[in-house]
Amino acid sequence: MIITALIAIAVGFLIGYLARKIIAESKIKSAENLARTILESAKRDAENKKRELLLEAKEEIHRMRTDLEKEIRDRRGELQRLEKRLLQKEETLDKRAETLEQKESFLEEKQKEIQQLEEQISLLYQKEIEELERISGLSREEAKAILLENVQKDIQHEMAVMIKEMENKAKEEAEMKAREIIGNAIQRCAADHAAETTVSVVTLPNDEMKGRIIGREGRNIRTIETLTGIDLIIDDTPEAVVISGFDPIRREVARIALEKLIEDGRIHPARIEEMVEKAKKEVDNMILKAGEEAAFEVGIHGLHPELIKLLGRLKFRTSYGQNVLKHSIEVAHLAGLMAYELGADALVAKRAGLLHDIGKAVDHEVEGPHVMIGAELAKRYHESDAVIHAIMAHHNDVEPQTVEAVLVQAADAISAARPGARREALEAYIKRLDKLEQIANSFEGVEKSYAIQAGREIRIMVKPEIVDDDDIVILARNISKKIEEEVEYPGQIKVTVIRETVAVDYAK
């Protein structure tokens, strides 16, 4: 039974093995057939692709050959055309060369004929000269000299007449043009002018205020006059006091300080000192504002701040009674208008016109003429050479070298010479007072000085650490002697030298 089972199992295994082998062989054969089919298909596709590529290559070769043949034909045609044109040019050149040869031969023949004619003319000319010399009894050189002399005289006379006519015409035209330019400039520049005075009037709320201004034993009025350098005139005029002084800046400081004191009501030396300092600062602001407004009115930009301050100070300076700042603005406008008419640099003319008297803002502090001082200030604050030259030339201290310098000079003369612009008497008076202060300030140890009482007195403040009580008598005598030598004045001048020592301490 067991053996039968084993045999059955063995037979089963054998049958299974044979079945698997048959199946495997069948799959292998199928795979081989498939591979063979794929390989044959690939060979057929490759052959087809090869034939297609060969056909395309043949077509491309044929196309390229056709294009090349066409290009060769075109090139040959172009070469043939060029050859034809070259042949035509050669023929043309040959014809021209032949024509030139003919012309050259013709010119040579004509040249020979001309030479023969020139020789004949030369012979005839020589014969004529010899005949003229024989008839006139003059040589050729002598006759030539006489002829040239006569011609020269005629030409010189005609030239002299012509030059004279041209000069007269030019002068007439220049004079007419100058009148027209100056007339237009004056018409377009309307400047107001008010005569400058040396007094200011301060209105009081009542006459009792006069006593408070004078103070106990006159200490308040003395303090005001000492600190400001002016004369305070208190008379019978109702509800008014008069501030007198030749320096407008000091007078303005005194006026503002006095008005502030009257408004405040507290009037004593300490308060006066405080108000005077405030007034000085306020006047400094007014000076700066006046300079800025002047530059803006004229249309000048880029001025150095120090020049603007100096311009503002000109508001408080006069020249023969004419306000120097208004005069400078007027000169700037006139010079600019005339420069526009002439086609010159109007900006340079206006700038130089505005700054031409800038030296007058400091001429009482610096020695030298205001022209040179102004030129030095302009140079210091980086003004252009053209502006500096115009400032230096406006009083002919140097010869004007530019049109703008001449225009500034002319505008200055127009502004100063017009009717009502200046008054000689006031200027001479102010110069005399200024001279008194300059003499006093020239001595060592003098801190400041003030000419008051219409020039009949000069008060001098000295530095106590330099000048002692014994020296002030000698100083007063020396100043008086120098005033007698250098200043012309009516009557007498009182010289007052003040030495004051103030000690301050604080209780803590």
UniProtKB/Swiss-Prot annotation:
Its EC number is 3.1.-.-. It is found in: Cell membrane. GO terms for cellular component: plasma membrane. CDD domains: HDc, KH-I_RNaseY. Residues 324-417 form the HD domain. Disulfide bonds: none annotated. Pfam families: HD, KH_1, RNase_Y_N. GO terms for biological process: mRNA catabolic process. Keywords: Cell membrane, Endonuclease, Hydrolase, Membrane, Nuclease, RNA-binding, Transmembrane, Transmembrane helix. It comes from the Bacteria. The chain crosses the membrane at residues 2-22. The keyword Membrane applies. The keyword Nuclease applies. It is a single-pass membrane protein. Residues 198-261 form the KH domain. One of its GO terms (molecular function) is RNA endonuclease activity. HAMAP family: RNase_Y. Endoribonuclease that initiates mRNA decay. Belongs to the RNase Y family. This is Ribonuclease Y. It comes from Thermoanaerobacter pseudethanolicus (strain ATCC 33223 / 39E). The gene is rny.
